[in-house]
Curated annotation (Swiss-Prot):
A single GO BP: mRNA processing
Gene from which the chain derives: PAN3
Segments of this protein annotated with the region Disordered: 1-38, 68-97, 112-146, 387-412
Originating organism: Cryptococcus neoformans var. neoformans serotype D (strain JEC21 / ATCC MYA-565) (Filobasidiella neoformans)
Lineage of the species this protein comes from: Eukaryota, Fungi, Dikarya, Basidiomycota, Agaricomycotina
Classification via SUPFAM superfamilies: Protein kinase-like (PK-like) (SSF56112)
Protein name in UniProt: PAN2-PAN3 deadenylation complex subunit PAN3
Composition bias, Basic and acidic residues: 21-38
Coiled-coil annotated residue ranges, if any: 545-583
Amino acid sequence: MLPPPKSAAVQIVRPPSPSSEKAKEKEKKHSPEKRETAQRICRNVMIYGYCKYQDQGCIYYHPPAGADPSTPQNSSPVAHAPTPSAPTPLAGTPAREKPTLSIEHLAAPVFVPKGLDSSPRASTPSVPTPSAPTPPVWPSLPSTGLLPRQDVQVSAQPSHAQLSATASPMAYDDPSHIALSAAHAHAQAQALTHGILDPHAHAPPVDQSMYLPPRQPLDYNLYAAPLPSIGGNPLYPTHPHAFFVSDDLRRAIQAKQEAVYAGANGASAPGLPQELGVYHSLIPLPLPAPTAQCPPTQSQPSKVYGLPSPVYRATSEVDGNTYCLRRVEGFKLVNQLAFASMDTWRRMRHPNIVGLKEAFTTKTFGDNSLIMVYDYHPLSTTLYDEYLSPNPPEPSPASALANQPPKRRSSPPERILWSYVTQIANALKAIHSSGLAVRNLDASKILLTGKNRIRLNGCGVWDVLAFDNKTPVQAFQQEDLLSFGKLIISLTCDFFQPTLPFSLPLEHISRHYSSDLSNLILYLISKPAQGQIKSIDEVVKMMGPRILNELDAVQSYADVLENELGAEVENGRIVRLLTKLGFINERAEFELDPRWSDTGDRYILKLFRDYVFHSVGVDGKPILDLSHVLVCLNKLDAGLDERVMLVSRDDQSCLVVSYREIKHCIEAAFNELKNAGNNHRVHR
C-alpha cells in the first residue's frame, strides 16, 4: 500500500539518470514492480494526447488509436483517482472515454531528440471553453483577466480531451513553445490539482519576430510638405525659401521685438519721472526725432479729449511686461464713481479691443494727471495716419507757387474696408453687450496692429473724463453707431468734412462701392423711427455675407501661420548636433586610452571640428564665418553624400569622407560613450 503523499500536487521534473541510486530508490518507491523502459508510456501522450516524435524514434510506449493510454501493456495495476467528466472535445479531435491520470504517469519522462539543447519541459495547456472554435494559426497571448466561472472545471487532474482540444499544432511545432521552466510547470500542476487557475501565470510570450517592429523616430532633417491649403496654392511658390519662415514674417516679428526695447537703457527719458507707481523706464511714444526742439513733456491738446494726452511706454515691476501709459494732463476728479466702470473694462478681453489694465491719478508729473494703463502693441499705427493724414507737400516750386492743399492718402479697397467694418462691429457688439459705450470712436483712436488687424484704443477714457450717471448708456451707444457711420464715410470719401451734409458722400459711395456698403452707411447715419432705436445686432445682420469672407481670410491666415510654425518645430537640431560633438571630442578621462584618443571615428570628428570651427585664412587669421558653420552642420544633419577633405593639424595627412559617413561616426561614438557612461560620475 502506497504511503499517503504530502501534497496532492506532483512536481514534474527531469527524470533522473538510470545509473543514479536516487533514481532507483524513487522508482522502487512509486512502482511495486520494475517495468521495462519500452513499456513506459510517453508523457507526451498522457499530457497532450499524442506525441509528435512517435515516428521519429521515440523509445517510449505509444498506445494505438482508440486504446486507453492509461493502461499500458504488461503493466501492473496501480491505484487511480477518479476524474470527473471533461467538456466535449472539439471537432476533428478523436473522442475518448473518460481517462484517468495517475501519479506515476505524471512522473513519466518526455522524449526530446538529441538535436534539442534545451531541457525537456512541458508546455502549459490552456483551459478551453465547451464551445471554443478551432484555434487560429496566429497564436494570441493569454489574457491576464479572470476566467469565467464556466471555463474552470474543478478537478484533481485535467482529462485528455481537455489537453488535446486546446493544443495548437503551431505551438508544438516550435520548440520555444514546448520549452517551459520547471517552476512554471510545477505551479500549473499545483493549480490543476487544487482546481484553481492563476490568470497571471501565463506562458511566456511568443516569438517577437511574429510582431511588427517598434516605430522608429522621425527623421527631423527631412522637411515635410506644406499644408494642402498652402501647397496647392499657385501663389505660394515652392522655392528654397519656402522651407523656412518667410522673410516678411521674420522681419515683422523681429521689428516688433526690437521696438519693445528701443530707447530703453534702464532709465526714463529726460524730463520724465524714473518711477510711476510700479512702472519704470518711461519712454514717450512715438519716439521723438533727434532734431526735436521741444522736450518730451510738452504735447499738444488732443482733438478727441480736449486735453494734452501724451502716451508713454513703461515696464512693470510686477510682471516685467511692457505697457502703454496714456496720461491726461490737468485732470480734475469730480466724482469717485467715475472709476466704477473701470472694473468692467479690465475684465473685457477681446481681439479687437486694446485691453485696459488699470487707471489711477498721480501728481508725479507736477500736476493732477490721469493715467490709463493699456496693453502695448509695438509698431502700431492708426487709421488716421494710414488713410486720413495729409501727405507731406512735394518739394517742387510749382506746388509751392500754386499753394495747393496737401492731398490725403488713398482710400482702402472695398475688400479691406469690409474687413475693418467687420472688426469694428465685432468690438462694438462686445462693448454694447457689456452695458458700456466707446464714446470716442475716431480714426485716431483705432490702432492698426498688423496686416488688416485693428483694435479700438482709448476705451474707458471718456467714462472718467466726462462722467455722467444721468444719461442712459443707450444714448451713448446710439452715438457710437453714428460715429461708426461717419468713420466709414471718411474712409471712402476724400472730400468728406464733418460739417458738410451727407448727400454728396452717399452719392459718391453709391457710384464707387457696392450697394451693401451704401445701405449699411445709410442705416448708421439715419435717425431711427419714433419709438425705435438702432442696434448693433441689426448692423451685424446687414453685413452677414461679408462676415463669411472675413472668416475665410482668418482661417487661411491661420493655415499660413501654422505652416510657418511647422518649419521651425525642429529648429534645435543643430544644437543637438553640437551637443553630441561636445560630448565626444577631447574627453579628459580618455586622454591615456589609446582606443579612444585620435583613433577611428573620434579622429574623423576631431578633424571635422577643426574644418568647421578652426579654419584659418591665407593671412593666418581665424575665419569667423557663421554661414560656413551653418551650412556644414546642416549638411551633416541631413547626411549628404557630398564629400569633404579633412586635413590634419600638421598638414601631413588628409581624409576624404562624406557627410553621411561623418554622421555615422557621430552616432557610433556617441552610442559607445553612452553605453560606457556612468551617471554618478562627478566632473573633475
